[in-house]
Amino acid sequence: MEVVSQIDQENQAIIWKQIYGFSESLLLKCAVQCEIAETIHNHGTPMSILELAAKLPIDQPVNIDRLYRVMRYLVHQKLFNKEVISTLNGGTVQVTEKYWLAPPAKYLIRGSQQSMVPSVLGIIDEDMFAPWHILKDSLTGECNIFETALGKSISVYMSENPEMNQISNGAMAFDSGLVTSHLVNECKSVFGDEIKTLVDVGGGTGTALRAISKAFPNIKCTLFDLPHVIADSPEIPTITKVSGDMFKSIPSADAIFMKNILHDWNDDECIQILKRCKDVVSAGGKLIMVEMVLDEDSFHPYSKLRLTSDIDMMVNNGGKERTEKEWEKLFDAAGFASCKFTQMSVGFAAQSIIEVY
């Protein structure tokens, strides 16, 4: 039998890691569903496996061995820490393993402003995974993989599934909170004195626009999105809500704001949306976008996330992430004269601010 070299073993390990890559996502989902982070956080001190099993919000008795093995994996993934505590009991040293939150686990606690729980539950979902299983079919045409897998577009799916729509809105709200914190604190010049009116196209439940309105009270803000999204958005005194279809009409303003909208669409659809924006932006106004910008050489720390998001867009709605050159080509086709790219440095630093004139 041929001896496997060290290099072959290393290369095989790479393939095995890819084969079992799903385990990271699904064990993360399991941790969120079982509320492991909240349980330990609320307890206030490290917990033994028996203490954790007794406090988890699970109706049936917990299998201690299986919970231990799940926690062992999550510790390996650096989501939780394990502490070995020695105590003296009647002359005998007793050793107990206890679990505590590692720094990333704070994002797995429901209810906090930093919570990424909606993103975990929204992305790592059986229906959301279904299109990925037929990814091969996307290589032979222009079919919408999500529609092929689930029989309907993602927008129709969300409108028919209120719970998933709410989770999706929660995920977008988290992202919006990170992005707008950077926008209003570090990039105030983007919202210059010349901007008196602003429309957030595809603004979801208004998280981003609420922050913009608070930071710049002189700007009259309008939230614009599909009817089922607007219906799920809270009433905000300083913001006007308008429902509609951006392919048909967009309210006019000095500035149009769009966060993670165009990556949902193919090039022709993007050009249609951009032309609508150009038609309604006041003279001297601009389009303000927050989008990922792919780097050609993939050397950025967020390159893998950006590339993964690109495939996610292809799978779920036929969209894509784009390079600077690809963005510039779209802006030119829509009749815009110039643009400016600014890489975000805090918050969700995988994204960029794009100003289009």
From Swiss-Prot:
Its EC number is 2.1.1.-. It comes from Papaver somniferum (Opium poppy). This is Norreticuline-7-O-methyltransferase. Optimum temperature is 35 degrees Celsius. Transmembrane segments: none annotated. S-adenosyl-L-methionine binds at D225. Expressed instems, leaves, roots and seedlings. It comes from the Eukaryota. PROSITE patterns: SAM_OMT_II. Belongs to the class I-like SAM-binding methyltransferase superfamily. Cation-independent O-methyltransferase family. Optimum pH is between 7.0 and 9.5. GO terms for molecular function: O-methyltransferase activity; protein dimerization activity. The active site is at H263. Involved in the biosynthesis of benzylisoquinoline alkaloids. Catalyzes specifically the methylation of norreticuline at position seven to produce norlaudanine. No activity with norcoclaurine, reticuline, norlaudanosoline, norisoorientaline, scoulerine, salutaridinol, oripavine, salsolinol, codeine or morphine. Involved in papaverine biosynthesis. The keyword Methyltransferase applies. Keywords: Alkaloid metabolism, Methyltransferase, S-adenosyl-L-methionine, Transferase. The keyword Protein transport does not apply. One of its GO terms (biological process) is alkaloid metabolic process.
